[in-house]
């Protein structure tokens, strides 16, 4: 938290981050509880969409998002993989609700029972077990590059494992291929030339093999990078060029917002135009980009009979774009604060405009 050199800052109740300042276990608890909220929302929304799903109306015209995502990865089809009948969708929804309760319990444990700081971790009992010493390694030292790179490495490995899971799911179970209108097994194409070239035309990708190849490559890069960050430490003097006096909780927050904002904007463009990753059968027809006060996408198909007034693709693309835009604004706000700029000086200057005087002398 930016304090502008004042060690005795009192934050308002609305500054939620202040509650977990320098309390790594509480910080973990807030993350786990947040995961529980997301998991609950996903499960509840899935069951709500399933309850109102009408097989006589195209799925993309019913304003859904959870079920289309599940259908895209081959969940909810009959044994032939050609007819979507909602099979196993209810299980996915209920499973998410159960997981949300587990996450909530873990969040409460970290918030109410476990030590506030993992550096002082002692679990439920005051003994020095090996797992407690291991937990202490995840203490938060915001201006310590060795601590931050150690934690970053674990995040990267988790992302890499998720990519492997997705690639193996497509290879063994299969995902929906709009080219044939059915679920099929997809072998990843680990052609590095294709992967490199798709950096510039990823919106036009029309091969599921290339999509899986990109995820396989990402898995390798992320796991390798994660191992590197866990194993290495700061080399040489820790200078301002490397982040000294800049690396902080607020700086890390700003970078996180930049990353999620950038991903949301990319997802918006991809969703609006690509029909391989976002099949028309589940999301509706592709969109047209328009410009008003800001960019936005509109439906190109006949909206007669569309349940929510817009296709799933339209609201999904637009919501992602605007959320991404505001995430980027949050990134700029927190990045500037992390650099030491005091926004209170701006409000003070504006409030003193009436009393400002300029004296001209010869």
Swiss-Prot record:
GO CC aspect terms: photosystem I; photosystem II; plasma membrane-derived thylakoid membrane
Location of this chain's protein in the cell: Cellular thylakoid membrane
Transmembrane regions: 27-47, 89-109, 150-170, 211-231, 251-271, 316-336
Membrane-related topology note: Multi-pass membrane protein
A matching Pfam family: PSII
Cofactor dependency: divinyl chlorophyll a; divinyl chlorophyll b
GO molecular function per UniProt: chlorophyll binding
Alphabetically ordered keywords of this record: Chlorophyll, Chromophore, Membrane, Photosynthesis, Photosystem I, Photosystem II, Thylakoid, Transmembrane, Transmembrane helix
Annotated InterPro entries: PS_antenna-like, PS_II_antenna-like_sf
GO biological process: one example: photosynthetic electron transport chain
Functional note: The antenna complex functions as a light receptor, it captures and delivers excitation energy to photosystems II and I. The Prochlorales pcb genes are not related to higher plant LHCs.
UniProt family annotation: Belongs to the PsbB/PsbC family. IsiA/Pcb subfamily.
Subunit structure: The antenna complex consists of divinyl chlorophylls (a and b) and divinyl chlorophyll a/b binding proteins and binds more divinyl chlorophyll b than does the antenna complex from high-light-adapted Prochlorococcus.
Other noteworthy facts: This low-light-adapted strain contains 7 pcb genes.
Protein name per Swiss-Prot or TrEMBL: Divinyl chlorophyll a/b light-harvesting protein PcbF
Native species: Prochlorococcus marinus (strain NATL2A)
